[in-house]
Each structure stands twice: as C-alpha cells, then as structure tokens.
Amino acid sequence: MAEQISSAKAEARTVRIAPRKARLVVDLIRGKSVAEALAILEFTPRAASPIVEKVLRSAIANAEHNYDLESANLYVSEAYVNEGATLKRFRPRAKGMASPINKRTSHVVVVVSEKND
C-alpha cells in the first residue's frame, strides 16, 4: 500500500542574492504556518523577501496541485539556503591594479508539510 505524501518542496536555483543575506529571511519563516510565513515575508524589508515568498508560494502550489494537500494545514517544515556558483568580476583600481568582486548566488529551498494534529 502506498504511503500518503504529506510534504511538498520548491527550489529556486542560482538566485542572484548572497546566501548570507537570504538566510536572514529564511530563518524568520522556518516552523511557521504558511499564512504566517507569507505575512512575515510581505512585511520584511529585505531584498531576499520577494524571492523567498515566490519559492514558498510555489511549494504551496505544489502541495495543493500535486499531492492534494490543504493549504490551511500546511507549515514550513524546512527552509534553507545553499551557496550557488559565484560570479567572479574585477573592479579597476588606482595605478593599474584591480580588486576582485564576488557576486554570490544562492539556492533557496522551502519544504511545506501537513500538520499532524
């Protein structure tokens, strides 16, 4: 007999935001209900907030569409940010020198699960 799937996952890979900055936002929503998490993200003035919100909405849509889960019963069971590829650039400086610039990217992952009441 097949086991009932009770979680759904969404990822955004190679997003142009530093992982350190994205983790600040992701830490706010971990363990919260999806309604509360969306409210938090809507009013958090960080560049990563819209990115994480989009991934969360995608995870909710995956849960509803693919696994027939009720969005009212969902919470953010996992949310983490891994480091993606780094774009390496150089900034010209005085006397013919150059300084390196690392444009960091992130892989944002959000997993939503059903509450076991």
UniProtKB/Swiss-Prot annotation:
Q: Name one GO cellular component term.
A: cytosolic large ribosomal subunit
Which is a GO BP term held by this UniProt record? Answer: translation
Quote the CDD domains the UniProt record gives.
Ribosomal_L22
InterPro entries to which the protein is assigned, alphabetical: Ribosomal_uL22, Ribosomal_uL22_bac/chlpt-type, Ribosomal_uL22_bac/org-type, Ribosomal_uL22_sf
Which superkingdom does the taxonomy of this entry point to?
Answer: Bacteria
* Database matches in SUPFAM superfamilies: Ribosomal protein L22 (SSF54843)
UniProt KW keywords: Ribonucleoprotein, Ribosomal protein, RNA-binding, rRNA-binding
Provide the GO MF annotations for this entry. Answer: rRNA binding; structural constituent of ribosome
Self-association state and partner proteins as the record states: Part of the 50S ribosomal subunit.
Family statement: Belongs to the universal ribosomal protein uL22 family.
What HAMAP family does the record tag this protein with? Ribosomal_uL22_B
Q: Function of this protein?
A: This protein binds specifically to 23S rRNA; its binding is stimulated by other ribosomal proteins, e.g. L4, L17, and L20. It is important during the early stages of 50S assembly. It makes multiple contacts with different domains of the 23S rRNA in the assembled 50S subunit and ribosome. The globular domain of the protein is located near the polypeptide exit tunnel on the outside of the subunit, while an extended beta-hairpin is found that lines the wall of the exit tunnel in the center of the 70S ribosome.
Fetch the PANTHER family from UniProt.
Answer: CHLOROPLAST 50S RIBOSOMAL PROTEIN L22-RELATED, LARGE RIBOSOMAL SUBUNIT PROTEIN UL22M
Q: What is the protein named?
A: Large ribosomal subunit protein uL22
Organism whose genome encodes this protein: Lactobacillus helveticus (strain DPC 4571)
